[in-house]
């Protein structure tokens, strides 16, 4: 076998070696050889290797009838792999093309693939495609099209099409250099020698899928894989070895995560093969990947130590055991001795003390010290269900999300049920709608460490800082939602946004300001109108707390049609919003309402 030296390759003149291994193949081999001779690309050599056929010389007579049109070799029987290796050692071409003695090439097989190579920068690329399945008599059964199974971009990811059973060895056009660099067929494998070698080569070689059908593959009862009794066991061993040898990096490249690769491989093996042992191994490895995935749970604490301890206890009973808890004491003034004592008892709990700067700064400190693949947040007055981390982690790995949240349950100060909030229905591409309605609650969130390292909480905001970050993340990513209550959010008078109209309205104003001051988010400023309407409504609640709320609310919304009209005037919306924010902060709600009404009469 010759190899390329350091010389430029004129691809149109490169020699392609077509190797035809045959054992007792007189019945079909003439069709195979004729299809090779009929190739429109003429710079080929056809090598026929007789693997010790025992058919009274019929195979040899057919081969010799072609004279010098082919290169014919006879050897002792050693199996298909040994026959291919014999041909490889004697080939002179720069490229290798396998043709089984019972298969057929379309006339343009080699020319078409060489044309593709000529258009590619990397001439060391392996070309492959689908095939036509035919019966013993050559009748067409169906077409096997890999692009009907995987998208084109995935068909060009080395290894993935192989591990989804989409590679037919006779469809390949492969540089011969890989036989030198990686090796040749394992002759000890009677029926899996092809996938064994392709696996080794595809780990180092680029591949290119071509949608053209260029070969006919014959399906018949005399094929080796159907006659060799231990074929299934050999396949189980082979596929199990694949799973053990693959690196995490390779799995991630193929499917986005090792867990997703393993579960999809298990599904493929279960649905398409009888290789139960390999399938069970893939499932076992997938479960282990989840078990080995560390989740960092960040709990900022400011006083209310008894609730903080309850929050910690809800984490300690999680069914997913691989976690760390980062307690960020944001300058508590209460006695924290009981809290620190609990932290010292469990090595999974890390305690940090800092001066009081608000929840955003506390969470950011946790993010900077987290080591898990994922981060989950839990406010010190809230609780996790015991299977929260397990369910959400599996959901994110299965769907390849980098951010997710769930539905939750509201409870009162004593932990009693108030209502269920199905916020988990909010999912997918939710931007820019998330600006005007953000139902994502802090203790329901889980995201990758990398995501939060690149997107910290805005520390200059103490109310609404969480929604600001969720909006920013949603503007660049799809949001995963689980409509299952996995957290409990405590509603407590005076300290909780849900129960404090002033805190709630300030949060809405902060979110609006955050959006308007961001160069990208500000393009969607009309979506902040509802935030300001809600803020104004909440502030009127404070102003009219001793009046008939229903009456005053109806009176206020008499002007609602005017506000709706603003949506069609994007050029004035930002001005109005900025004026509103400034007015509310400096002059109060009564003056602001009067100012808005006067401004609208003048400009709209």
Description of each model-found segment:
Residues 108-142, 387-418:
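Conserved donor NDP-sugar-binding/catalytic core segment of glycosyltransferases
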């Amino acid at each position: 076998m010759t190899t390329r030296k350091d010389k430029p390759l004129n691809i149109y003149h490169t020699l392609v070696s077509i190797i035809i291994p045959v054992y007792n193949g007189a019945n079909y081999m003439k069709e195979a050889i004729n299809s090779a001779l009929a190739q429109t690309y003429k710079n080929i050599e056809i090598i026929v290797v007789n693997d010790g056929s025992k058919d009274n010389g019929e195979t040899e007579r057919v081969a010799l009838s072609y004279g010098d049109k082919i290169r014919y070799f006879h050897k002792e029987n050693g199996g298909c792999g040994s026959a291919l290796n014999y041909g490889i050692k004697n080939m002179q071409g720069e490229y290798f093309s396998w043709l089984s003695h019972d298969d057929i090439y379309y006339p343009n097989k080699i020319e078409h693939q060489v044309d593709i190579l000529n258009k590619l920068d990397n001439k060391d690329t392996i070309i492959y495609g689908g095939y036509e399945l035919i019966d013993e008599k050559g009748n067409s059964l169906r077409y096997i099209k890999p692009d009907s199974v995987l998208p084109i971009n995935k068909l060009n990811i080395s290894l993935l099409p192989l591990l989804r059973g989409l590679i037919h060895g006779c469809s390949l056009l492969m540089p011969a250099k890989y036989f030198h660099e990686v090796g040749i067929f394992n002759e000890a494998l009677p029926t899996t020698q092809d996938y064994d070698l392709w696996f080794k080569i595809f780990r180092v070689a680029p591949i290119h899928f071509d949608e053209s059908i260029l070969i006919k593959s014959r399906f018949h009862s005399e094929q080796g894989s159907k006659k060799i009794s231990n074929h299934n066991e050999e396949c189980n061993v082979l596929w199990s070895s694949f799973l053990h040898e693959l690196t995490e990096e390779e799995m991630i490249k193929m499917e986005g995560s090792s867990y997703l690769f393993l579960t999809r491989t298990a599904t493929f093996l279960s649905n398409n093969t009888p290789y139960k042992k390999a399938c069970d191994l893939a499932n076992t490895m997938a479960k282990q990947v989840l078990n080995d995935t560390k989740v960092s749970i960040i709990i900022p604490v400011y006083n209310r130590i008894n609730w903080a301890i309850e929050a910690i206890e809800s984490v300690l009973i999680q069914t997913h055991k691989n976690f760390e808890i980062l307690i960020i004491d944001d300058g508590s003034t209460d006695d924290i001795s009981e809290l620190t004592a609990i932290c010292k008892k469990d090595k999974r709990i890390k305690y940090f003390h800092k001066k009081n700067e608000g929840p955003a700064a506390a969470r950011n400190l946790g993010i900077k010290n987290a080591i898990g693949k994922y981060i989950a947040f839990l406010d010190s007055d809230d609780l996790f269900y015991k299977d929260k981390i397990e369910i959400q982690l599996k959901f994110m790995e299965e769907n390849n999300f980098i951010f997710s949240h769930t539905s939750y349950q509201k409870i009162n100060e004593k932990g009693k049920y108030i209502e269920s909030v199905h916020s988990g229905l909010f999912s997918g591409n939710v931007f820019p709608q998330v600006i005007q309605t953000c139902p994502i609650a802090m203790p329901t969130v889980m995201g990758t460490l990398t995501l939060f390292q690149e997107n910290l909480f805005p520390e200059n905001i103490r109310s609404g800082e969480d929604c600001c970050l969720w909006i920013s993340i949603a503007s660049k990513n799809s949001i995963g939602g689980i409509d299952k209550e996995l957290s409990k959010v405590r509603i407590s008078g005076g300290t909780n946004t849900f129960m404090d109209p002033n805190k709630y309205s300030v949060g809405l104003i902060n979110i609006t300001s955050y959006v308007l001051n961001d160069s990208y988010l500000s393009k969607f400023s009309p979506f902040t109108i509802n935030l300001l309407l809600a803020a104004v409504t909440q502030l009127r609640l404070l102003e009219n707390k001793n009046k008939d709320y229903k009456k005053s609310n109806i009176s206020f919304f008499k002007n609602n049609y005017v506000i709706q009209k603003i949506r069609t005037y994007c050029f004035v919306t930002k001005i109005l919003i900025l004026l509103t924010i400034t007015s509310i902060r400096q002059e109060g709600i009564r003056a602001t309402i009067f100012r808005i009404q006067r401004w609208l009469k003048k400009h709209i």
